[in-house]
Every structure is written in C-alpha cells, then in structure tokens.
C-alpha cells in the first residue's frame, strides 16, 4: 500500500480546504481504523493547532499514526458535541478519553401489569409495564434494599410463570418474605395497599407512610384485631430501623454528586447517586494515559459518555467547572429527551460538603487503583522476562474449552492486563450444533466433533477473523490450556492468518496437580517453574479464571438447553400437558423428582408417557450431576 502523505503533512494539506465553522473530525490510521474523534467550534482553527511545535508526546504519536483525516460540518457547537459523543461511543478510538466501564446501573422494578405486582432487580431501559426506583451503584446495595423490602412488605419476587404454576405456598411464605398471593393467602385489595406503601417508602415519603400505618394500627386495635395490629406495629419498627441506617437528606433530592481527582497521569471520577434525598451508593471511574489533558476536558468527555447510557438526575453537582457548560447541558438534554437539568459547582454549604466527601472517596479509590496497577505491572514484567517478550504485555488472552464427550461444548477467551481481569472483553464461543432434541446427542460441528484440537482450531479461527477488524485489540501474549499438540494447532492457525503473536501452552503436570504445570513454547524444551514463584502463581490464576469461566458457560448452556427441551421435546407432551404437570407439582424441579406412579396421576398423562417423561428427566439429572 502506498500513501503519499501522512501525519503533520496530511493535516497541513487538509487545513487549506477546512471550513471555518463548527464540526467534528476523525483521524484514521493506515488500516483506516478511527484513532481519534474531536470536535471544534471552528474546524480550520482546531486543525491548525496540530501543526504547532509545542505538542505533547501523546498528540505527536497520534499525528504520526494519522494517514487519513475526515471532518463533518455541523450546524452548531451543541450538534458537534452530540456527534462527537456518538462517534466516540461507536468507534472507541484509542487516543480519546474513553469510559470503558459503561454498564448500566441496577434498579428496583415494581411491575404494574399484574393483579399482584412483583418486586425485583432490573437492569435496562425504562419500561411501560412497571415503575423503576434507583439507580443503585451496585448489586449489593440493590439486593440489600430488596431484602429489607421483602421483610417489611412481603411482596412477591417470583416470575409470572412460577406464580401461575403454584398450588401451595413456596419457601418465601414460610420464612415470612411473601404473603403468597399465588394461592390466595392475601386478596387483591390488601395487596394493593402494600404496593402503595412500597412506592411511598422508595419515594422517601416515610413520614406520611408511618403516620398512615399508625392510624391503621390504632383502628385495628379498637376493632380487637390484635394480631393484624401487631403486624402493622412490627412494620413501623422495621421502617424506623431502616431509616436510621439510611439518612435522608433535605439538601439534595434527585442528584448525582461528581468529583474528579488526578495523580500520575491517571484520573478518577467518583459518582455518588442520590434519589429522593436518599444515598444509593457511589462508584469510581478511572481514566489513564491522559497526558496534558485538563480536568475540564476529562469531565466533559465523561459527562457526555456517561449520560448516553445512565439515568439523568435533575441536578449534577461537581467539584470542578467545565468548559462550554451550557452546551454540555443542552447536549445531555437532547440525548435523553429531557427538559430539566442543571450543573452546579458549590463552594460552600451542605452541597459543597457532599462534593468534598465524594472527592475524598475519589482520592482513596485512585490510590487503591494505582497500587493495583503497580503490583500488576511488576508481575507483568516477570511475565515479559519469562517468555522473552519485546515489551511488558498490555493485553493477555487466555483460552480454554469445556464439554462432556463433545456435548454442550464451549470455548472461552479471558483477558487480563495491568488493571487485572477485563471482564468486558471476555468472549464465549459456542461449539455445539443448535439443533438439539431430547433423545439425541448434542452434536459438535463436523470439523471438531470429539476433537479437542479441532475445538481450539475453531475458536482461534473465529478470534483471528475478528482481529482483522480489531487491530487495537491485538494481544501481547496468548496462553492456551493445553500441551504439545495444542502448540501445533496454534502455530497452524496463526500461519493461516499471517499472525505472529507470542503464545504459550500450559498443561497440567503429573497426576494433573496444580504446581506441576508444564509450559510449552515454540523452539524450546518443555519446562516447569517453582510453584512458589510469584509469576507461576499469576499464571495459575490466569489459567484458573479461564477454566472456571469455561465450566460456568458450559453448565449454563447445558442447563438452558436441557431445561427448555426436557418437557417441550418429548413426544406427546404439548403445552397443555406441560402446564398440567407444572400445576400439579408446583415447579419444574418437583416434576424432575417425581416417580412414574406420581407422574401418571396427572390428568392426561398415561403410564407409558409417565415412563417416557421419567426416563428423559432422569437422563437430564445425571447430566447435571456430571
């Protein structure tokens, strides 16, 4: 491939025709991968900055890697902000400040499309069939809140299918976590009262709620309904206890507190969530390699990326100002189709104290993060020396597979780096045929059936095919769970794709004992390491993570396939008989545990059909226990 100009000369040539208006520009590398997306109030002026002599090292590296430059004209700065945020999210350019951990926060969902609404944890977009409360910063916090709610209000948490199949109360009723509406232990009217009380509690109308409960308790007492009055009394006590644990603030109602701190080319942004005056937890976000980036730039990038996915409060309270604040507000409002949003930076008062608290938490989080990086970098240096790598590995990919005699086969890829395991980059490769019926084996694809090497060949072929479109995710080192034969397969697939990635195969030693692992590399004799060496322990941790991830996904796929098909695919068991079985026994598990005689008692199930069902389900149980 021949390119006439690149880098600084390319930018100079583009400046000549660049317009003097707002817009977005993209820098692309030699393989036409987007490496940077930027916005500008005036495109010509912004591009001119890249040919100055006082640029930092990061910008110089970016320019040196630029072989193509494209720009898009926008009607306004706000439109440029919006487009820039969308393109960064789409292309994830390596020279941009990226929000890598952008998973959605969990909520508590109260389903309202059922006579007896369900209370459960929920992730995702707002739905029309329920009301969401949150967001919560972690699963722990939402689970703790749900547990408290179930103790106090005893609303159901089961699925509609499970609810509809019950013929007797489940364990939740026995441990006083549910009123068992599924079998008529509570009527619709009384259940609706509980639903309203849950709403009041989650919207922090607790004073009003407690007053209403006190009145109800007195009313029941005057009617000599002492058992019901005692239950209301216990509910009031439980609510008071929960309130003591979670202080409700008057100073903020619906806000995100955001503080940014900086140390050693690393930023941490701590987000504390407050809804209805109640703290819903906080979570840190880290940004690295931000050489010469300012607090304002990092915060602006963060806000525009963060609020593309997360719920926007009515107020964002920060410890640092940003450039073009009004434009950022307008962009966030347009992204989320909202009309009410303010961003403030308080310098005194209660809100300033909350910001300072978030800043202290951010500093602590950043210090812990940097300690983790330092420790992992030291280990990575040992890995570099051990395998004679050209540089400290940035990305290590570990591969393993799991199956039972070729059934439910999966291959997995686990990724590790200086910040530890990068779970967002984990991948699962399904290696089984999708055509599964009870009574027939789940077949591997023809080219890999019963062949461990064939499975690895399939996984690597798919991985390298994808790598052609993701050159920025090229691993520094690959570790494969296997021995000498696997070494040959890896080399064969690499040669086919023209790849030259350092790799090592790691096999269990004598009697498959941990600590006796053998390492296989091209052109070297098989060798082992002292099991007490830090680098050996690290390699074992990597291998075990891949192994556990493979087993988890194998079992998940096996359980899902069998559970779906165990009843659905038995000849003679249609929807009516399946429903009859579930209604009679109360759950799928109870059907599996039933004897032939018990199965035959269900209306529509003959003795011969009961025998067939019993045999199929027991085959499933034997697989689950293997």
Swiss-Prot record:
One of its GO terms (cellular component) is excinuclease repair complex. InterPro entries: GIY-YIG_endonuc, GIY-YIG_endonuc_sf, GIY-YIG_UvrC_Cho, Hlx-hairpin-Hlx_DNA-bd_motif, RuvA_2-like, UVR_dom, UVR_dom_sf, UvrABC_protein_C. PROSITE patterns: GIY_YIG, UVR, UVRC. It is found in: Cytoplasm. It holds the Pfam family UVR. GO terms for biological process: nucleotide-excision repair; SOS response. Transmembrane segments: none annotated. Residues 20-97 form the GIY-YIG domain. Keywords: Cytoplasm, DNA damage, DNA excision, DNA repair, Excision nuclease, SOS response. CDD domains: GIY-YIG_UvrC_Cho. Residues 207-242 form the UVR domain. SUPFAM superfamilies: C-terminal UvrC-binding domain of UvrB, GIY-YIG endonuclease, RuvA domain 2-like. GO terms for molecular function: DNA binding; excinuclease ABC activity. Its main location: cytoplasm. Belongs to the UvrC family. The UvrABC repair system catalyzes the recognition and processing of DNA lesions. UvrC both incises the 5' and 3' sides of the lesion. The N-terminal half is responsible for the 3' incision and the C-terminal half is responsible for the 5' incision. Interacts with UvrB in an incision complex. This is UvrABC system protein C. It comes from Rickettsia typhi (strain ATCC VR-144 / Wilmington). The gene is uvrC.
